[in-house]
From Swiss-Prot:
It is a multi-pass membrane protein. GO terms for cellular component: plasma membrane. Belongs to the Lgt family. Catalyzes the transfer of the diacylglyceryl group from phosphatidylglycerol to the sulfhydryl group of the N-terminal cysteine of a prolipoprotein, the first step in the formation of mature lipoproteins. Its EC number is 2.5.1.145. It is found in: Cell inner membrane. GO terms for molecular function: phosphatidylglycerol-prolipoprotein diacylglyceryl transferase activity. The lineage of its organism: Bacteria, Pseudomonadati, Pseudomonadota, Alphaproteobacteria, Hyphomicrobiales. InterPro entries: Lgt. Its main location: membrane. This is Phosphatidylglycerol--prolipoprotein diacylglyceryl transferase. A 1,2-diacyl-sn-glycero-3-phospho-(1'-sn-glycerol) binds at residue 153. One of its GO terms (biological process) is lipoprotein biosynthetic process. The chain crosses the membrane at residues 25-45, 70-90, 138-158, 193-213, 217-237, 255-275.
Length: 292
């Protein structure tokens, strides 16, 4: 704990990364955040699959019971993809020098972009195996995903990781783990709001007011575009992370971060999904097809 006085809002002393110790086992907010997020996506998807009028041809693309079969695969793919993304893309030198640190996911260190790749592979595999339209499968998962992202970002705040740049704004926070104990943007909470709860509201409105699920790929396309934009904005307020050396050499002092660079392919993917959604003639006349 830093002994210096805080010129802004002091980090709440009651917040601890560990919820409770059960003998030698510790329950972490970070791990619980992932569990709650995945369970919310499962619950919300089941609710929407019951509402036939939301879907193209008034026919949900899958039985609501099947989404439960995907929960385990989604959890595994997110954790494995997210951790591999962190290890291979963000800090390979450290993790290869400290291989035991690779499995300590409860301490944080999960790449959203890696998790997205992991669950995308799982969704494509599951959709093909169960004869589900791939873009519809993307929509089913994407529609509730922002809540999970928002919860995990709050857990980042509790873990005192990914804090923001130094600022004089009155809502600045002093993090005890910051060696300089300076007032900083609570960028984790900015991300929780933009990437999480605000994006969820946008998808909610698109789903219920504009019936976006009737064109498979629309919801997932907007989700990916929305996340990429929100992440790029939040990168402005985040304290710089240690980017790969080759990237730092190319973009030194430009303000263009590695997180922004990783979000660029997401923009292209999101617009591609939207293009496919509105090009697909089968969603105009009510007929469905299983190929993408």
């Amino acid at each position: 704990m830093n002994d210096f006085s805080c010129p802004a809002i002091a980090f709440p002393s009651f917040l601890n990364p560990v919820i409770v110790h059960l003998g030698p086992i510790a329950l972490y907010w970070y791990g619980l955040g992932y569990v709650v997020g995945i369970l919310f996506v499962w619950w919300y998807a089941q609710k929407l699959l019951k509402k036939q009028s939301l879907w193209y041809a008034n026919h949900p693309p899958m039985d609501k019971e099947k989404i439960g079969d995907f929960v385990v695969w989604s959890a595994i793919s997110i954790v494995v993809g997210g951790r591999l993304g962190q290890v291979l893309v963000w800090d390979p030198i450290y993790y290869f020098s400290h291989p035991t640190a690779i499995i300590t996911i409860w301490n944080g260190g999960m790449s959203f972009h890696g998790g997205l790749i992991g669950i995308t592979i799982a969704m494509i595999w599951f959709a093909r195996k169960n004869n589900i339209k791939i873009r519809a499968m993307f929509d089913i998962i994407a529609i509730g995903a922002p809540i999970g992202i928002g919860i995990v970002r709050i857990c980042n705040f509790i873990n005192q990781e990914l804090w923001g740049n130094v600022t004089t704004h009155p809502w600045a926070v002093c993090f005890p783990l910051d060696p300089y104990y300076l007032p900083r943007h609570p960028s984790q909470l900015y991300e929780a709001l933009m990437e999480g709860f605000l994006l969820f509201v946008i998808l909610f409105i698109l789903t219920f007011a504009f019936k976006a699920l009737k064109r498979p790929g629309t919801v997932s396309g907007i989700f990916i575009i929305g996340y990429a934009i929100a992440r790029s904005i939040s990168e402005i307020y985040r304290a710089p992370q240690e980017d790969p050396e080759w990237f730092s050499t190319l973009f030194h002092s430009t303000g263009f971060t590695y997180g922004m660079a990783l979000s660029l392919p997401m923009l292209f993917l999101g617009f591609y999904l939207l293009f496919q959604a509105f090009k697909d003639e089968s969603t105009k006349n009510g007929h469905t097809q299983t190929k993408n």
